[in-house]
From Swiss-Prot:
<feature type="binding site">
    <location>
        <position position="193"/>
    </location>
    <ligand>
        <name>ADP-L-glycero-beta-D-manno-heptose</name>
    </ligand>
</feature>
<keyword id="KW-0808">Transferase</keyword>
<feature type="binding site">
    <location>
        <position position="273"/>
    </location>
    <ligand>
        <name>ADP-L-glycero-beta-D-manno-heptose</name>
    </ligand>
</feature>
<dbReference type="InterPro" id="IPR051199">
    <property type="entry name" value="LPS_LOS_Heptosyltrfase"/>
</dbReference>
<keyword id="KW-0448">Lipopolysaccharide biosynthesis</keyword>
<dbReference type="GO" id="GO:0009244">
    <property type="term" value="P:lipopolysaccharide core region biosynthetic process"/>
</dbReference>
<comment type="function">
    <text>Glycosyltransferase involved in the biosynthesis of the core oligosaccharide region of lipopolysaccharide (LPS). Catalyzes the addition of the first heptose unit to one 3-deoxy-D-manno-octulosonic acid (Kdo) residue of the Kdo2-lipid A module.</text>
</comment>
<dbReference type="GO" id="GO:0008713">
    <property type="term" value="F:ADP-heptose-lipopolysaccharide heptosyltransferase activity"/>
</dbReference>
<protein>
    <recommendedName>
        <fullName>Lipopolysaccharide heptosyltransferase 1</fullName>
        <ecNumber>2.4.99.23</ecNumber>
    </recommendedName>
</protein>
<dbReference type="Pfam" id="PF01075">
    <property type="entry name" value="Glyco_transf_9"/>
</dbReference>
<feature type="binding site">
    <location>
        <position position="269"/>
    </location>
    <ligand>
        <name>ADP-L-glycero-beta-D-manno-heptose</name>
    </ligand>
</feature>
<keyword id="KW-0472">Membrane</keyword>
<feature type="binding site">
    <location>
        <position position="188"/>
    </location>
    <ligand>
        <name>ADP-L-glycero-beta-D-manno-heptose</name>
    </ligand>
</feature>
<keyword id="KW-0997">Cell inner membrane</keyword>
<keyword id="KW-0328">Glycosyltransferase</keyword>
<dbReference type="InterPro" id="IPR002201">
    <property type="entry name" value="Glyco_trans_9"/>
</dbReference>
<dbReference type="InterPro" id="IPR011908">
    <property type="entry name" value="LipoPS_heptosylTferase-I"/>
</dbReference>
Amino acid sequence: MKIAIIRLSALGDIIQSAVVLQFIKKFKKDIEIHWFVDEKFEGILKNHPLIDKLYALPLKDKKIIQSLRILLEARKNNYNAVMDLQGLVKSAIVSRILSRNNFGFDKNSLKESFAHNFYNQKLNIDYNENVFVRYLGLTSFMLNKYFDPKDLAFKEDVFSVDEKLKQLLSEKMQLTKNKKNILIHVGSSEENKIYPKTKLALLCKLIIKEFPEIKIFLGWGNLKEYEFAKEVIELGAISQDNIEIAPKFSLEELIVFAKSMDLIIGNDSGPTHLAFALNRPSITIFGATPSYRNAFKTNINKIIDTGKKITNTKHLDKSDFCISTIEEEDILKLVKELFGDE
């Protein structure tokens, strides 16, 4: 059996979607899986052991003709089934080009409801439902095999780690000389999803006061986030022995570094969600985005939110900065809980 999975973007969504791979392979080891991703995010899935062939489409660069050529060539693979985990019009069209036997969500289960017109097989599942439940639900629907979301608590790492690179990074960053290493991702895709720098600086000070032998690394993805991280250190007046800005990582290096951490803290963003994918302890900070939908809680993967009820997840209020009401002390409590009050 040969199937194709469509999940073009963005980083966090690809990281979360990739969990279905191990469920599929455990069900039937010999299923051949091809994955279609945007060229920009190819690095996160490159050399994935459960993906038999990865197709990178230059859609973000608006290279439509080139993308179409790749798709028409891939269509010759004669897929038994194609599954669109993205649920947008462009991803639905991609799935339709690849096969008539394509699976997606129905019009009531999509943000871009028009996309349902391109699917042959459609699943009804509430758009407000947890994303992992949605992804596993569509996978179950395609393979006619029930996958229990509760099994996510026992999943294997979603991404494999290059042990040689892990050792090199550990030596370069001198990780072994610290009792604990914490990675804090400062950014996110929207301003209102970012924990304020003044509060983050205070949180770092509180953590260091509680755990003097730890090292905090501030993760960033662009120049704006780099400047943000610099300001956090300046505002907190924190010693370089305890905090530093992480280097600019490739996606492969980010996976390896995340796996080396004792704790990862961050906003609702791709790099933060990588912690859950790699079974590393984490705290995800939610403001105006729904924690019940965008994350999966486990004993080691904690969430903190404002307690605000977000019922319409299709239309989130980008002017809502309620994330700033979350107290640093409440995040510290979760850190202490995960570190066992050492």
